């Protein structure tokens, strides 16, 4: 066993924590909106993955401390209250090797509960660490703490972590999570020379609480019932807003973020969409991009000028920095795909890709032009896995048959909450999710119970083997990115309309090495058949990753091996989160209506 690597990013203005991960209580008061806040910062160097990181198959323990606090920040030039992690926006990068144990001590100084999800990691044997309040745990209370511990097994690639409580991810609680392996198909030094993270997200000038409460009200947000377009686009935590539109005299126009890459190299760019709403289209002037990874699966993909990426997805591309000399600069363009927005305006976020060498860093802005074949604003929103065949580099064929198949019909509609209030929301199988946040479904099943089908749609698979999940997006004009917790899936087939169980025997499926992902963009009025192996006991969330849709109930669960779940041993620290809480209470709006 390798040595313990402690990487504690401590917020300097907080007093020392004394056994907080054991007591569940913090010695410092939770955030008070009336108290002046520290200023959260963005460190561009964290998005540069160092060649000094040792990629090895010798497992070790990587330990982090996350302090969640309120702070002030103006990542796009407009100052607002944010949720920072260790006074960073976005939060720290977690970097590990396959086989490593990751320990994260989360100290919650906020005025609301929290839970941290490790997006894309399977959590083999550690379902209770998946980080979803009301599904796999009770919330980390204000002034409380909790330690997540899990081993990264049989996975490598690009992942990320984020809050799964309400839509506070949109306030800043997220960060990249990169897993290396000496056995992964893409090798540093052979397939690429340098490694960079490019994380994109929409950014609102209002806090997520304000937006969610408005969306579930009759008035809507900014007079509309539909999720908003961002006020700005952030690239690696920085962007540029329209200061004139804000009406704020203190608004500034910051320089665009920069991504420095050595000249004459092969550079891997790991794109992560942490957006709460839009699909983005990303291009780099003068540079073609070879797609080599999606959602932690190394693939053979096309070389293209522009990628599309929806919330929760990750794509790695390789570019060759041979289009100029040291000091040259090129625009990286991130545009909102307007065809899948209810309403919207043309919005482009810019970053500078700058060639570096042995000399000093230049500062001139690029004068490059966009590719002439980029998508138009009204081009239909189509995922890359639908436009191209992304063939996994590690061959895994699918069986002709499955043990069982379940259907989840996804649709916007009128619903009534547990308090008798009527609202327009989203659901699966005519059920909108309402979250009994202090009685997690994983614990319900462990006690021998079942999921309440009037509160959440669910699919249960009792036995180990290949099983099918059919998602029918019945919203004819609304696309959704669906994310599966606890496993990746093989994309067996997709098409227009809806697929029923009666149709399945006559449906052509992809059996030869299907694309493997954990997040899939589905156009309105379409179906997709996802194949999983039901070998990881747990209650796993399956939901739309548009945070504002999730706020209005677009969540289901997949229950895998309920008999095995009954054998889970609950650590005392996990049980303490639920102590002295009302098990009949309903949770925040991202999971229900209140």
Swiss-Prot record:
Cu cation 2 binds at residues 119, 162, 545. It is an enzyme of class 1 (oxidoreductase). Cu cation 3 binds at residues 164, 485, 543. Keywords: Cell wall, Copper, Disulfide bond, Glycoprotein, Metal-binding, Oxidoreductase, Repeat, Secreted, Signal. InterPro entries: Cu-oxidase-like_N, Cu-oxidase_2nd, Cu-oxidase_C, Cu-oxidase_fam, Cupredoxin. Glycans are attached at residues 67, 124, 242, 286, 320, 358, 397, 430, 452, 458, 508. It catalyses: 4 hydroquinone + O2 = 4 benzosemiquinone + 2 H2O. Disulfide bonds join 138-578. Binds 4 Cu cations per monomer. It holds the Pfam family Cu-oxidase_3. Laccase that catalyzes the oxidation of certain aromatic compounds, including L-dopa, to quinones, which then polymerize to melanin. Able to oxidize a wide variety of aromatic diphenol and diamino groups in the ortho, meta, and para positions but not monophenolic groups such as in phenol, tyramine, or tyrosine. Plays an important role in virulence. Plays a role in dissemination to extrapulmonary sites but is not involved in pulmonary growth or in elicitation of cellular immune responses in the lung. Belongs to the multicopper oxidase family. This is Laccase-2. The lineage of its organism: Eukaryota, Fungi, Dikarya, Basidiomycota, Agaricomycotina.
């Amino acid at each position: 066993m390798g040595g313990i690597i402690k990487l504690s990013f401590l917020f300097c203005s907080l007093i020392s924590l004394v056994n907080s991960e054991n007591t569940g209580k913090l010695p410092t008061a939770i955030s008070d909106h009336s108290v002046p806040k520290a200023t959260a910062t963005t460190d561009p160097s964290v998005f540069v993955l160092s060649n000094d990181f040792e990629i090895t198959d010798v497992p070790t323990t990587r330990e982090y401390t996350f302090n969640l606090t309120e702070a002030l920040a103006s990542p796009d030039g407009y100052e607002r209250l944010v949720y920072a992690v260790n006074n960073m926006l976005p939060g720290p990068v977690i970097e590990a090797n396959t086989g490593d144990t990751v320990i994260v001590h989360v100290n919650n100084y906020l005025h609301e509960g929290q839970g941290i999800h490790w997006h894309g990691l399977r959590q083999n044997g550690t379902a209770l660490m998946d980080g979803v309040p009301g599904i796999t745990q009770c919330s980390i209370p204000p002034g409380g703490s909790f330690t997540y511990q899990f081993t990264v097994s049989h996975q490598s690639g690009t992942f990320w972590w984020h809050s799964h409580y309400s839509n506070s991810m949109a306030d800043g609680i997220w960060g990249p999570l990169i897993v290396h392996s000496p056995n992964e198909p893409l090798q540093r030094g052979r397939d690429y020379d340098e490694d960079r993270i490019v994380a994109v997200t929409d950014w609102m000038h209002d806090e997520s609480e304000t937006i969610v409460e408005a969306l579930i009200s009759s008035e809507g947000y900014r007079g509309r019932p539909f999720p908003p377009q961002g006020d700005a686009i952030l690239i690696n935590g920085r962007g540029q807003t329209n200061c004139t539109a804000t009406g704020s005299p203190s608004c500034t126009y910051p320089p665009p973020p920069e991504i420095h890459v050595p000249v004459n190299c092969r550079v891997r760019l790991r794109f992560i969409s942490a957006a709460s709403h839009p699909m983005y289209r990303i291009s780099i002037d003068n540079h073609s991009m070879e797609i080599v990874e999606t959602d932690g699966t190394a693939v053979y993909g096309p070389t293209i000028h522009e990628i599309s990426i929806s919330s929760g997805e990750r794509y790695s591309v390789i570019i060759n920095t041979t289009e100029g000399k040291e000091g040259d600069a090129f625009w990286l363009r991130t545009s909102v795909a307007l065809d899948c927005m209810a309403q919207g305006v043309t919005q482009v976020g810019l970053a500078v890709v700058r060639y570096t060498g042995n000399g000093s860093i230049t500062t001139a802005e690029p004068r490059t032009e966009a590719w002439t074949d980029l998508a138009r604003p009204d081009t239909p929103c189509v995922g890359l896995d639908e436009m191209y065949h992304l063939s996994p580099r590690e061959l895994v064929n699918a069986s002709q048959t499955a043990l069982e198949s379940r259907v989840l019909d996804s649709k916007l509609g009128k619903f009534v909450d547990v308090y008798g209030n009527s609202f327009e929301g989203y659901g699966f199988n005519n059920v909108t999710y309402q979250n009994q946040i202090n009685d997690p479904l994983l614990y319900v099943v462990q006690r021998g119970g079942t999921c309440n089908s009037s509160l959440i749609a669910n699919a249960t698979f009792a036995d180990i083997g290949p099983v099918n999940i059919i998602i029918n997006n019945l919203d004819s004009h609304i696309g959704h990115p669906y994310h599966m917790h606890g496993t990746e899936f093989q994309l067996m087939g997709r098409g227009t309309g809806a697929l029923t169980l009666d149709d399945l025997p006559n449906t052509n499926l992809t059996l030869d090495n299907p694309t493997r992902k954990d997040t899939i963009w589905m156009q309105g009025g379409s179906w997709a058949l996802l194949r999983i192996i039901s070998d990881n006991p747990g209650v796993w969330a399956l939901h739309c990753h548009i945070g504002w849709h999730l706020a209005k109930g677009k969540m289901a669960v997949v229950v895998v091996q309920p008999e095995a779940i009954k054998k889970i041993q609950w650590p005392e620290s996990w049980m303490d989160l639920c102590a002295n809480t009302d098990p009949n209470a309903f949770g925040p709006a991202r999971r229900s209506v209140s």
